[in-house]
């Protein structure tokens, strides 16, 4: 009986020690690594896959260029390059930093993408930025920025949706038939161009500057300290 009791006590000690060790190691496993950009920029080139949507996240800058190279150029700090993810799935081209890296500071990551004539949506989040150097054309187009991201683009479409949230910023020149605009949580949208019809919904200290965006038929709904400046040449409904 004494021998059995001794084994039980030792086993209990081993379990306690193992549990303590896991608790110490867990933060690096759960929260990943942090990397500071070296400042030494290197370049990598890959073949451009088929895509019709561009998504950028985690402070990555994406530039859409009119150069028909068929290639995507990635510029990044040499100690961050291996963690830059540029891939296409289901027509969605994503440029971001690998999830294994929890925090990136002083990084400079720019992904240059050729305009392939099929892009119909731009989505930027988490302090990322998308800039189009050419006018993008599609039947239906979507622009969405969130979490301090920024999008600068020119679009021609039959219909267009523009959405900004969480302190993001959109600056767009748009020529469209029908447009839906929405912003919240201190986001800002600046529009130029024209639309036949436009529906606008602004809330929570968001701001729309559209004095240079002429609309024939416009409805505007603002709430919670939001502001909207519009240029309506015909019917205007405001709440």
Task: Tell what function each PLM region has.
Residues 1-239:
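Intrinsically disordered, low-complexity terminal regions
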């Amino acid at each position: 009986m004494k021998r059995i009791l001794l084994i039980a006590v030792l086993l209990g000690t081993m379990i306690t020690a193992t549990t303590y060790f896991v608790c110490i190691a867990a933060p690096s496993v759960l929260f990943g690594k942090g990397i500071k950009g070296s400042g030494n920029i290197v370049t990598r080139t890959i073949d451009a896959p088929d895509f019709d949507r561009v998504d950028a996240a985690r402070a990555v800058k994406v530039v859409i260029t009119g150069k028909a190279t068929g290639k995507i150029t990635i510029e990044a700090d040499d100690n961050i390059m291996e963690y830059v993810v540029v891939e296409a799935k289901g027509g969605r081209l994503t440029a971001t930093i690998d999830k294994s890296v929890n925090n990136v500071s002083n990084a400079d990551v720019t992904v240059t993408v050729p305009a392939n004539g099929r892009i119909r949506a731009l989505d930027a989040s988490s302090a990322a930025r998308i800039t189009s150097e050419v006018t993008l054309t599609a039947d239906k187009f979507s622009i969405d920025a969130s979490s301090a991201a920024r999008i600068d683009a020119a679009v021609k479409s039959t219909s267009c949706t523009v959405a900004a949230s969480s302190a993001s910023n959109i600056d767009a020149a748009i020529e469209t038939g029908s447009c839906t605009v929405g912003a919240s949580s201190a986001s800002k949208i600046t529009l130029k161009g024209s639309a036949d019809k436009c529906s606008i919904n602004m809330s929570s200290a968001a701001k729309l500057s559209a004095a240079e965006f002429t609309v024939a038929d416009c409805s505007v709904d603002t709430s919670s300290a939001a502001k909207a400046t519009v240029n309506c040449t015909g019917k205007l409904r405001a709440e």
